[in-house]
From Swiss-Prot:
The keyword Zinc applies. GO terms for molecular function: kinase binding; zinc ion binding. It comes from the Eukaryota. Its main location: nucleus. PROSITE patterns: ZF_FLZ (PS51795). It is found in: Nucleus; Cytoplasm. May act as an adapter to facilitate the interaction of SnRK1 complex with effector proteins, conferring tissue- and stimulus-type specific differences in the SnRK1 regulation pathway. GO terms for biological process: response to glucose; response to mannose; response to starvation; response to sucrose. Disulfide bonds: none annotated. The lineage of its organism: Eukaryota, Viridiplantae, Streptophyta, Embryophyta, Tracheophyta. The gene is FLZ5. This is FCS-Like Zinc finger 5. A zinc finger (FLZ-type) spans 77-121. It comes from Arabidopsis thaliana (Mouse-ear cress). Belongs to the FLZ family.
Length: 147
């Protein structure tokens, strides 16, 4: 036994085909001859035929009905058109995403939106970095300091 290894219980074996015994010496059931076939009246034949048709029809119909749909059937609103140029996005073509909720038809549209957003952030950042501090002087001078 190796160090650090623990013994496992023996694997329980299942019945294999070699363990199943078939008695081939028994006579098999003979197929009915033409004389043994019973004639079925017309009404019984219609009932049997109708049951077979019903089973075939039910086999084709999904038990869940037509309510089942795939997630690809539903596309989010932002995946329908380009966020910049509003062009319809074609199914099966590449969609370029930006910030998780914006879809674009091309790399160019995506890059234009990125530059627009960067400009907006720079403008907001420059406004936030300037803080106006009022001094205690009577002249009302203001001092701004960059943070």
């Amino acid at each position: 036994m190796l160090l650090g290894k623990r013994q496992r219980p023996p694997i329980k074996r299942t019945t294999s085909l070699s363990e199943i015994k078939f008695d081939l010496n028994q006579p098999s059931e003979q197929e009915p001859s033409d004389h043994q076939i019973q004639l079925v009246n017309v009404d019984e034949h219609r009932q049997v035929h109708q049951r077979l048709l019903d089973q075939r029809l039910l086999a084709m119909v999904s038990p869940r009905g037509t309510q089942r749909r795939h997630s690809s059937d539903y596309s989010e609103d932002f995946l329908r058109s380009c966020s910049l140029c509003k062009r319809l996005l074609v199914h099966g073509r590449d969609i370029y995403m930006y910030r998780g909720d914006r879809a674009f038809c091309s790399l160019e549209c995506r890059q234009q939106q990125i530059t627009v957003d960067e400009r907006k952030e720079k403008k907001k950042g420059s406004v936030r970095s300037t803080i106006v501090v009022a001094t205690g002087t009577t002249t009302g001078e203001r001092v701004s300091a960059a943070v």
